Design a protein with these regions (language model features):
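Hydrophobic alpha-helical transmembrane segments of polytopic membrane proteins
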Residues: 211-246
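Transmembrane alpha-helical segments of polytopic membrane transport and secretion proteins
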Residues: 1-21, 242-259
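Transmembrane-helix boundary motif in ABC transporter permease subunits
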Residues: 74-103
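Periplasmic/extracellular loop-to-transmembrane helix junction in inner-membrane transport proteins
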Residues: 3-8, 35-79
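Short hydrophobic, aromatic-rich alpha-helical segments embedded in or entering the lipid bilayer
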Residues: 44-54, 205-218
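Generic hydrophobic transmembrane alpha-helix motif, especially the helices
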Residues: 103-140, 147-148
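Short cytoplasmic-facing helical segments at TM-TM junctions of multi-pass membrane proteins
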Residues: 141-144, 148-189, 210, 214
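Transmembrane alpha-helices
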Residues: 131, 135, 168-201, 228, ...
């Protein structure tokens, strides 16, 4: 009989494939630079990117903190607005018929084209980039929340009717807990969408942040710093995604979702 896997064994089994893939990509990257003798402005070596990440050429802490605030703010705004609208869609068929076409219209707007309008209305700063990130990330939360609130076991709803529970109580005690896995799955998508939105905003309407660093360093052919900014963006995105995964395991440990 096989012995139960220890905590260390579970961690290794869970993260070893990703770590192995990461190492393989680094080796392939370094091999391509070495074999093809690529110039630094085309593709810098991994070690050169690490040096750029830890160097003092760029005030990384300042740019990193600004982008992090934008991403977290965009994620929080998209999540809150998305859940609220999803509840509204599921609450009333009239609201659903009124809101869904409008939300689809908003979601299909090209966000790069909307970004300059936010700059015109709000000026430079963190808020426009947060709004762009929220605009990209809110729609999956709306749809998943509405679906989760609707896909409820009829026996549970019958139980609520037996006790003459009002509609708001059925939502609070039956429908919303049922929607947790759907909402949390959507928030994982929103976590990455918030990163994309914040960086798009910094490309168009910012004078600070990691997206701004990429734009300025590409213009000067300083590719190692541009790659370093990309890595820092990925680190922030992974951190936000990881926090959502941890929250999902605590709030809805029964949910079968892909981490």
């Amino acid at each position: 009989m096989a012995s139960p896997m220890t905590g260390t064994g579970r961690v290794i089994r869970r993260y070893l494939p990703a770590a192995a893939l990461f190492v393989a990509l680094l080796v392939a990257w370094q091999g391509a630079v070495t074999v093809f003798q690529l110039r630094e402005y085309l593709l810098p070596a991994p070690l050169r990117v690490v040096q750029a990440m830890t160097g003092d050429e760029i005030p990384w802490l300042r740019h990193l903190s600004i982008t992090s605030v934008e991403i977290v703010g965009a994620f929080g705004l998209a999540g809150a607005v998305g859940v609220f609208l999803g509840v509204a869609v599921a609450w009333s068929p009239i609201l659903s018929r009124a809101l869904v076409p409008f939300l689809v219209f908003v979601n299909t707007l090209p966000k790069v084209a909307v970004a300059p309008l936010f700059l015109l209305w709000l000026g430079y700063g963190v808020l426009p980039n947060m709004l762009i990130g929220a605009l990209i990330g809110f729609f999956p939360v709306v749809i998943n929340t509405a679906v989760g609130l609707s896909q409820v076991d009829e026996e549970l709803l019958d139980l609520g009717r037996v006790f003459n529970a009002p509609k708001w109580k059925v939502f609070a005690t039956i429908r919303i807990p049922n929607a947790y896995p759907y909402i949390l799955s959507a928030l994982k998508v929103t976590a990455t969408a918030a990163v994309v939105g914040a960086i798009v905003g910094e490309f168009v309407a910012s004078q600070q942040g990691l997206g701004y660093v990429i734009i300025t360093t590409q213009g000067s052919m300083n590719t190692p710093v541009a790659f370093a900014a990309l890595v820092w963006i990925s680190v922030v995105g992974l951190a936000v995604y990881g926090l959502v995964v941890l929250a999902a395991r605590r709030i809805a440990p029964w949910a079968e979702t892909v981490d």
